[in-house]
Amino acid sequence: MAEITIPLRDVIEVTEDATYAGVEVTSAIRIGTAYGTTDRILIKTVKQNYVLFTTNKVSILNAINA
C-alpha cells in the first residue's frame, strides 16, 4: 500500500468530479478504485491534480476543510 501526502498549502480547488472515471482531467493521478457507486473528489494542486475514488466522501471533505 502506498501513502500519498497532498500538502494543504498546495491545494487550489477541491470539487466533486461528476465523470465516471475522472476522465475529464486525463493527467490526474487516480487514487482508489472506481466502482459504479464510488464518489469522486477532484483535488487541483499547484503541481498535480488528483482524483480520489471513495465511499466516504463526507469524511475526506471534512478533513480537507478542517
Swiss-Prot record:
Checking InterPro entries in the record gives:
PH_SunI-like
In terms of Pfam families, this protein maps to: bPH_8
Which species does the entry assign this protein to? Bacillus anthracis
According to the lineage, what is the superkingdom?
Bacteria
Q: What is the lineage of its organism?
A: Bacteria, Bacillati, Bacillota, Bacilli, Bacillales
Task: State the family it belongs to.
Answer: Belongs to the UPF0457 family.
Write down what this protein is called: UPF0457 protein BA_2525/GBAA_2525/BAS2348
